[in-house]
């Protein structure tokens, strides 16, 4: 039964990405899946509920991938940190469809809920990396968890769709300011967080 539910989600997500959420109908999902209408409604009461489930699944996959980077002791501390944060990028996890839906004005509450989940769970994944950085002498802070919360909150706001609209020189200025912020909060050497440059630029492209 679970496999059929995932099949519906996979098929619907493909259609949403190809055609757009508003342009995709339940009838088209039924035609693509070749399942009975009653079967689909057994799992989902509406197209919106299907998208909610896709978003929830996307978030869970992002957390799983992020945790894998955090736990990989074969990587350097900064590689684990950058990899873990890159994995939390929902756009790269599932393509543009999910974020395009979240960014619609009518979905503001859903977007806020998604960000809240990220802000609640991501620091728990990233905290051991920061603690390893402190132990290694690469970072220093009395407030590692709170620092992560503030950095993640700022990142969600600063490097979203509004960042893409900035001219290149303004983007670079904001990126350099973010690196300065990281180095200041964690009392790290200059250049330590430079790998974040490519991460943010990739996420925002």
Label each PLM-derived region with a short phrase:
Residues 53, 67-98, 151:
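Hydrophobic alpha-helical connector segments
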Residues 124, 128-132, 136, 161, ...:
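C-terminal peripheral helix-coil segments that are non-catalytic and often amphipathic
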Residues 79, 114-118, 131, 135-151, ...:
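All-alpha amphipathic helical-bundle segments outside canonical DNA-binding/catalytic cores
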Residues 93-127, 135-138:
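Short secondary-structure transition hinges
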Residues 58, 62, 66, 92, ...:
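Hydrophobic recognition helices of helix-based DNA-binding modules
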Residues 47, 58, 62, 84, ...:
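Hydrophobic/aromatic residues within well-ordered alpha-helical segments
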Residues 7, 15-49, 53-57:
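Helix-turn-helix
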